[in-house]
Amino acid sequence: MLDSEECQHCDYGRDPVDSKVVCKIVITSDEGALILLRADTEKFPNRWDLPGGHIHIGESMEKGLRREVLEETGLELTNPIFKIYSIDRESYYTTKLPDGEITLSHEHTDFIMVRRDGMPDNISKKFVRAIKKVL
């Protein structure tokens, strides 16, 4: 995000305690499928997204990631979280799908469970890179 932009769904860009660090997570089922969320933003309409988001200043990556996933999916991550890699201000992690039902927030309109060979076309290449490192 550019310095002048504001997130429509949180206080990012309006609240000085928010950072520009973003964490995303590849959450996989025992069957090898992963969760993708359909974004509901003007900037990325109908794009598929990995769960995650902005990490607040003073918040650990893991705590921020757990908070973002709970906000976006209603899932409480109880399994260990492993770092895949970081590039620029974005970090990618992975974990196993916890028990529970997915409940979407206002940030997303839909979700799918998809295998690597069934990836949709409208997903960022950087997300696909992270997914390929896990699956």
Q: What do these predicted ranges mean?
A:
Residues L2, K20, T28, K43, ...:
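A generic fold-level signal
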Residues R38, E107, S124:
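Surface loops and adjacent helix of pleckstrin homology
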Residues I55-H56, G118-P120:
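Short histidine/acidic/glycine/proline-rich micro-motifs that form metal-
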Residues T28-R67, E71:
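Conserved Nudix-box catalytic region and its N-terminal flanking loop in Nudix hydrolases
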